Amino acid sequence: MTDGGGEKETEILGLHGSEVILITDTEEFDLIDNYKKIRDCVDSSVNTSVIVVGDVMLDRYIYGYANNLNTTAPVPVLKETDRKSGAGAAAHVARSLHDLGLKPKLFAAIGDDSNGVELEQSLENLGIDTSNLTMIEGRKTTVKTRIIGSRESLVHNKQMLLRLDGEDSEPLHDELQKPILESVLKEIPNSNIVVISDYGKGVINPKAAEEIISSAKSANVPVIFDPKLTGLPYSKGSDAVLFQSRGMELMRRRLNYENTDETAQHLLKENDWGGLFVIGGKDGVTLHRPDADSLVVPCTLTQTLQQIGLLDAAAAALCVSLTNNLEMDDGAILVNAACECVLQGEDLDGYVLTKKGLTTRLDESAWQMQISQR
């Protein structure tokens, strides 16, 4: 697009509030350099110690062909072709951090059942330290089983047909919670970042969250919090908080605001957050900061395949950003690139953020900008 003076402008990176930002050629070159700088940060993020505390679960996937309906009911009949499983939730974050070259220390509880053993073994097979996983006698390990089907003639159009959840979401008793919390608090001074991943399965409670955040602040260790909407008070004082867009819309309605920008400012001030990252999938990533305009980094994908692991990828990317002292705007760019990697995932391994996937995505984004200038 050309203005009256003949200078070319390009719509890129975003929006501030509802206003489209028009970036000139000179600014776009700066943005390309910025992408390259962010990409270099991904390469240099090694040996950073990250505490990941929260709920873990075993993600199980059953794949097959759904060519027919049952003769007595309108339900698909799945011809099973494959089964896969891997560690999910907070363990998903740890897996991504490990692949990115950081050093995750995972603090969580699992059951003393075969699923707990499988979850622990899957992490050990990846080289992730499991010494801080607590096996609780008589507790059931959370398992999410997703049944995914496609027509045999359309193998690339997979759809989730059903999800089965097996879980024990009762809060841990104090005598079981206390050793986990004490271990986390002891490790905070030796760590660079804390990630709290609350899936409402019993590990995180108000007292634990408050003590972890307070201890981290005292040690100048930033906290990233992925909260349940019912647990927002737990997250007070966090440096960065992650929401999904549907959660943000729910909060807007609950608080009776006209738009999500007003909602975000309310939440930021009420909970003393440093920043709020709203993950929108195909709608990109929106960054809200206290008393500042919002920034939207749009998703550049022409097609998205799934959304499993989006917030986990975002949390891992934020760790890279904080490790390298990037500005929050650059952090939003990195988070968006991480989400784009996962949005293209086609199977269990594709739902986990990897260094190769993230650097490739950043390279592609910078290349697309260069092409657009020709």
Task: Outline where the language-model segments fall.
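Short glycine- and acidic-rich boundary segments immediately preceding or forming the N-terminal edge
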Residues: T2, G6, E11-D25
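Conserved phosphate-binding/catalytic region of the ribokinase-like
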Residues: T26-I38, P171, N190, K207-G237, ...
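Active-site metal-binding loops of divalent metal-dependent hydrolases
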Residues: D55-V56, Y199
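Conserved N-terminal subdomain of the carbohydrate kinase-like
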Residues: D25, V50, L58-V195, V352-R374
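Conserved beta-alpha-beta core of the PfkB/ribokinase-like small-molecule kinase fold
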Residues: N67-A73, V77, I147-G166, L172-L181, ...
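A secondary-structure boundary/capping signal
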Residues: V53-G54, Q244
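A short acidic-Thr-Gly-centered motif at the start of a beta-strand
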Residues: K36-V46
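Structural beta-sheet core signal
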Residues: V52, L106-A108, F225, V278
